[in-house]
């Protein structure tokens, strides 16, 4: 009998019997074994952490706040934080180490040669990490943004045809119509003179309007009256951002008992219900009519995103499930509206700030539209806007909608200088940092569209400019986004003169996308109708 057994029985007030002595002794042995295993595991973790720390010593790091907080709270998601980050990048041009508290190291990569091994790696070697993207999982499921391994590869293969030029061309009419609705609102608000408007507010609704038509063939009139579905998407984006900055909400069992967590769940249910209803109704029609008759009935109409996914098949004829299609549709709605609205808003801001470039873009667009009765851009017109495209690219360099992407290494990754990123480390590929790296982009603060002049190509790495990421996990919808960007910018310049509202200071705010702290206000002045 263990000496402690007799004492334990006495403390519990239990009579000594052979069975009780045996049972308590066995229980204590199991408890000791469990504690030993726990201690062993803890020691292994400590040893692994120590080895990782030693391997990370070769990477430079900015001064920490202290040993406990590390760099936590030093680079806040606001204008001051971006300026502090720029000061660091002026001295550390390739890769740097930051500590989120005492035990979570992150490597930040800010140079084309150093982001190449990460962005070029397969989804199995450098998948999206769960720490930064996990909050979106209940909303977006296993769509392209969050899925991994074979599932990601299969979905990427099946979704690629949805972004073929032949599918995108009919969307041009939708882009034109959505821009027309927004511009009609602007004219009404301006009443013939200049009016100050928040670009993010108006353009975000416009991109959501376009996306609902492109994804679901559904006209919600959300630019005129907010729908429950659109309200839910906007709320989900805001709640996801808020959760990132509340450490106690990182734990699901706490978050979903909070007011924010309950609202997040309700908004998810709303979005999922809408998407699922559309998919099921469309699938029933497809099965009843058959693919050939169903496609024939679609002639003359735009084939939307849901249609393409319902028709998608593997080599063996296997189709995507309703859940798979829902995840991809929700992902496209999330990724497509915020990023594009950010890109358009910052582009219009730059043209308002530099009227000489605005006027040159306007002249280019007027030349393309000369002799037309309708102010409507067609697919082939997009290639006739070289200077406008240069301005868009420079704006995406200076103000990338997505400022960083994160990856978690599942194996050691070697950098160009021979240093090794240890397995298990989370790496932040800083798109903003790369686009503002002074060794890659001289005078990076200056807005200069001629950096992208095709007649004067610069000797730069293809990875110096990555607003849509790069490699196997690059943005599948970048052609869609660039088409919408050019249409909306072109029609806006054709109809309005833009200027900066000097009474409202622009202060950047990197969240899920690059926003501003108090809106992006521009003065919008209607131009007289074309002769």
Swiss-Prot record:
It is a single-pass type I membrane protein. It holds the Pfam family p450. It is found in: Endoplasmic reticulum membrane; Microsome membrane. Its EC number is 1.14.14.177. The chain crosses the membrane at residues 23-43. It comes from the Eukaryota. GO terms for cellular component: endoplasmic reticulum membrane. InterPro entries: Cyt_P450, Cyt_P450_CS, Cyt_P450_E_grp-I, Cyt_P450_sf, Cytochrome_P450_Monoox. Changing residue 436 to D: In ARCI5; results in impaired synthesis of omega-hydroxyceramides. Residues 1-22 are lumenal. It is an enzyme of class 1 (oxidoreductase). Changing residue 372 to W: In ARCI5; results in decreased synthesis of omega-hydroxyceramides. It catalyses: triacontanoate + reduced [NADPH--hemoprotein reductase] + O2 = omega-hydroxy-triacontanoate + oxidized [NADPH--hemoprotein reductase] + H2O + H(+); an omega-methyl-ultra-long-chain fatty acid + reduced [NADPH--hemoprotein reductase] + O2 = an omega-hydroxy-ultra-long-chain fatty acid + oxidized [NADPH--hemoprotein reductase] + H2O + H(+). The keyword ATP-binding does not apply. Its cofactor is heme. GO terms for molecular function: heme binding; iron ion binding; monooxygenase activity; oxidoreductase activity, acting on paired donors, with incorporation or reduction of molecular oxygen. Its main location: endoplasmic reticulum. Keywords: Endoplasmic reticulum, Heme, Ichthyosis, Iron, Lipid metabolism, Membrane, Metal-binding, Microsome, Monooxygenase, Oxidoreductase, Transmembrane, Transmembrane helix. Residues 44-531 are cytoplasmic. Changing residue 243 to H: In ARCI5; results in decreased synthesis of omega-hydroxyceramides. Heme binds at residues 335, 475. It is linked to Ichthyosis, congenital, autosomal recessive 5: A form of autosomal recessive congenital ichthyosis, a disorder of keratinization with abnormal differentiation and desquamation of the epidermis, resulting in abnormal skin scaling over the whole body. The main skin phenotypes are lamellar ichthyosis (LI) and non-bullous congenital ichthyosiform erythroderma (NCIE), although phenotypic overlap within the same patient or among patients from the same family can occur. Belongs to the cytochrome P450 family. A cytochrome P450 monooxygenase involved in epidermal ceramide biosynthesis. Hydroxylates the terminal carbon (omega-hydroxylation) of ultra-long-chain fatty acyls (C28-C36) prior to ceramide synthesis. Contributes to the synthesis of three classes of omega-hydroxy-ultra-long chain fatty acylceramides having sphingosine, 6-hydroxysphingosine and phytosphingosine bases, all major lipid components that underlie the permeability barrier of the stratum corneum. This is Ultra-long-chain fatty acid omega-hydroxylase.
